[in-house]
A protein has these predicted regions:
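Glycan-recognition and catalytic cores of secretory/periplasmic carbohydrate-active enzymes
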Residues: 1-171
Length: 171
């Protein structure tokens, strides 16, 4: 097997992130989500999409690897776009863990900003409210219970969202 050159891989990732930032409307809270085959521009999503925390999280990881303050500024901007997920009456589903911990979790880890810690704790609280003690799992999609006539639904993704609950319990 060929050796992995981590520095080169991180440089490539950083270049892709910068390219994406150049293409994105930075006065917007739309997040790059996906790109179809043969497409040259990103499909964007709003903050309520289940993937919305990934882009700020990627920016935080890039900042951690490069120390680039411009990347940090963008990471802060896109992270703070997600505050309405925890400060409004937004009805969360299990994806709140992805949305909040990838973004605010990394932001808090790298800055120590107490507002970010509060956002993580509020996100964890919203997720914990979806726990059903009868079933012993977290409800994935509250909106589907009534619509589909399900008494409860839990999908595998919930396992990935437990991290925010464990973190909140320690903090």
């Amino acid at each position: 097997a060929d050796p992995i050159h981590l520095d080169r891989q991180l440089e490539y990732c950083d270049a892709q992130i910068r390219r994406t930032l150049n293409e994105a409307d930075q006065d917007s809270c739309l997040m790059p989500r996906s790109m179809e085959a043969n497409q040259t521009s990103w499909n964007m999503s709003n903050i309520y999409d289940w993937t919305s925390g990934f882009w700020p999280g990627i920016l935080w990881y890039d900042y951690e690897a490069t120390g680039n303050e411009e990347i940090k500024a963008q990471a802060i901007c896109y992270t703070e776009c997600l505050f309405p997920l925890v400060t409004s009456a937004h009805s969360a589903d299990h994806d709140i863990g992805f949305q909040i911990f990838c973004s605010f979790g990394n932001a808090y880890r790298m800055t120590g900003n107490q507002e970010y810690k509060a956002a993580i704790l509020k996100g964890a609280e919203k997720l914990a409210k979806l726990y059903n003690p009868k079933v012993g799992t977290i409800l994935s999609w509250p909106g589907m219970v009534k619509r589909m006539g399900w008494s409860h639904n839990t999908i595998m993704d919930n396992m990935m969202n437990l991290e925010i609950l464990f973190w909140a319990a320690r903090n």
